[in-house]
Amino acid sequence: MTRHPSSKRLRATVIVRREEGILLAVDHSGLVLLPGGGVDHGELPLVAAARELNEETGLIATALQFLFHHESPTNLHHVYYCVAEGIPTAADDAERLLYLDQPANASPLNLSAATRTILARYQAGGRC
């Protein structure tokens, strides 16, 4: 995994919005996250976003648009909006998938702090 000069891990984070809502992945510990993961050495964040989305959900990214960076205590997230094809199926680090249909419905979910912040910024119209 590639590190930012500040020694933070580089991550590609993907927002897929469908009719059902925003796609989220639940990991094996029950933590709810946006699909995504580490950027491999020499890999472009855009390529990592498409790869991680496919690994975790089986979806194929047909269009990715950079939205913004989000810096957490340990990671530097490259956040992308994604149009994707396919039927989502949990795989890799995702134990199951779910959709967030309304921002108000996020409070009972065990969202990671970064996911909560990224979603809030996206829903407020966050851009680069």
Describe the residue ranges of each PLM region:
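Short hydrophobic/aromatic beta-strand or adjacent loop that forms the aromatic wall/cage
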Residues: 9-13, 75-79, 114-116
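Short, well-ordered beta-strand micro-motif
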Residues: 16, 79-83, 99-101
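Conserved Nudix-box catalytic region and its N-terminal flanking loop in Nudix hydrolases
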Residues: 17-55
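NUDIX/MutT-family hydrolases
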Residues: 90-128
